[in-house]
Amino acid sequence: MGKKAIQFGGGNIGRGFVAEFLHKAGYEVVFVDVMDKMVEALQQNKSYKVTEVSEEGEHTTTITNYRAINSKTHESDVIQEIATADVVTCAVGPNILKFIAPVIAKGIDARTESKPVAVIACENAIGATDTLHGFIKQHTSQDRVESLYDRAQFANSAIDRIVPQQAPNSGLDVRIEKFYEWAVEKTPFGSVGHPDIPAIHWVDNLEPYIERKLFTVNTSHATTAYFGHFRGKKMIADALEDKEIRGLVHKVLEETASLIVAKHDISEEEQKEYVEKIVSRISNPYLEDNVDRVGRAPLRKLSRKERFIGPASQLAERGMKYDSLMDAVEMALRFQNVPGDDESAELANILQEQPAEDATTNLTGLEKEHPLYPAVLDRVRKVQQGTK
């Protein structure tokens, strides 16, 4: 029997990143989603195209050998598929992990295969597989938890690939940047060995990869979006052509770089080169990346372990500079009532309804005693008072 991977989430990252590399590694991919239209489209089309976009031009890969199941209506089928799968991946958004955990737990519990299934969450979040693992344990009966690791192994991953806004008529096809990084920790697999997926860079310690990526790629992308939105720019590439915005983004990245160099075994020179590469990537006009798309979901992006408060809190704890990150936080706080983005409306509501102290705690998860708290509180007050 051939290799089989279950991919939760049929969105652009699921189809255009994870499934592409699973397909290239020889896996049959079973997409699991709750969106009727997405599942039906995957069921009705036997192939779709992933087009890599770069300055050198375009390269298209046709993805085949996949199926799709609606977990809302066919949960028992999903359980059976997981029971005989080699790999389970997901790209659903960090907030959705708790909703997919119950069916994954049932699927793992139904396994009789001698080799455990590899579970890898592919989310823009630190320790996403650990989070999913925790939810799966909650949905596993107590007498089965101890033997859970005979049936499944859990490895965190760091993913990096920019997926711009897709054309409205693109269907299942995905346009995506050529560059990618997919790092996964190999230690959890022990003597069993990790799955054979050539696109994955298997590492002993994932934290440097995750933090470097989140605090460089995601921080710079969102910073560009929030400053760009504030200044009326429509596209990320246009925003970065504005010398002032580009300078502000570089100042933010100098601060996150100082943390990465201080904390991880990465030299100043190496991080500087990485920063230049990232700014060049997000400046790519061929990606046609929309400012409001990149800025959406500001509540998640302002949260405790995310791209702004995550590095700023660690810098504050180390007594290091974080002023430019606070400028970015202020711009994120000003990303309110953007059409099509529920979180930006909720952000506006929180800032309007709650006192500054409550809003600061609720938005960022920072304790009042934390050294970063006063600086964030100042920005919240400033935005609430409507001062520029």
Swiss-Prot record:
One cellular component (GO) term of this entry: cytosol
Alphabetized Pfam families for the sequence: Mannitol_dh, Mannitol_dh_C
Catalytic activity: D-mannitol 1-phosphate + NAD(+) = beta-D-fructose 6-phosphate + NADH + H(+)
Broad EC category: oxidoreductase
Purpose of the protein: Catalyzes the NAD(H)-dependent interconversion of D-fructose 6-phosphate and D-mannitol 1-phosphate in the metabolism of mannitol. Has a strong preference for NADH over NADPH.
Family the UniProt entry places it in: Belongs to the mannitol dehydrogenase family.
Protein name: Mannitol-1-phosphate 5-dehydrogenase
Protein's organism: Aspergillus niger (strain ATCC MYA-4892 / CBS 513.88 / FGSC A1513)
